From Swiss-Prot:
UniProt name for this protein: S-protein homolog 1
Species in which this protein is naturally found: Arabidopsis thaliana (Mouse-ear cress)
Keyword field: Secreted, Self-incompatibility, Signal
Keyword Cell division: no
Family indicated by similarity: Belongs to the plant self-incompatibility (S1) protein family.
Keyword Signal: yes
């Protein structure tokens, strides 16, 4: 009998993961009910290029394409989301400035990242030499990645 319960539970779980996602009242989806979000997060990308350049960004996850954005100096782009119960939420961005570009992960399931982001808000700032993550624990920007030369 125990094997049958485990088998039925496995079938229900796999159906929940593959079910069609339907938007319900207030923006809640069926997936949110079946696989609840663990915590709410915000990711922010800031153009801190002191040369006055426009920063091009294109951010996405497996499920969401956040579109192409051109950020002027000191402008920011933010999005909110809930990490899923499977801890598989993952966002990355392509960024481009006049003489450099990069593909960079901006959110993934990692306790060190969570600590640096203060368990709620990851702030990435593009500067002339690279991309920095605001470390809320130490109160300073930390260089995460340097620009690759070219387009």
């Amino acid at each position: 009998m125990n094997c049958i319960k485990q088998f039925l539970l496995a079938i229900c779980f796999s159906l929940a993961l593959t079910c069609q996602d339907h938007v319900l009242v207030g923006g809640t989806t069926t997936r949110d009910i079946i696989v609840p979000k663990i915590s709410e997060w915000q990711v922010t990308v800031v153009n801190g290029l002191t040369t006055g350049e426009t920063l091009f960004i294109h951010c996405k996850s497996k499920e969401d394409d956040l579109g192409e954005i051109n950020l002027k100096f000191r402008n920011r782009f933010s999005w909110n989301f809930g990490e899923n119960m499977l801890h598989s939420t993952f966002f990355w961005c392509y960024m481009n400035k006049d003489n450099g570009h990069m593909n960079v992960n901006v959110f993934w399931d990692d306790v060190i990242l969570f600590h640096r982001c203060g368990w709620k808000n990851c702030i990435w700032t593009a500067k002339t030499d690279g991309l920095y993550l605001w470390n809320s624990a130490s109160g300073e920007d930390v260089l995460s990645r340097k620009w690759e030369v070219g387009w």
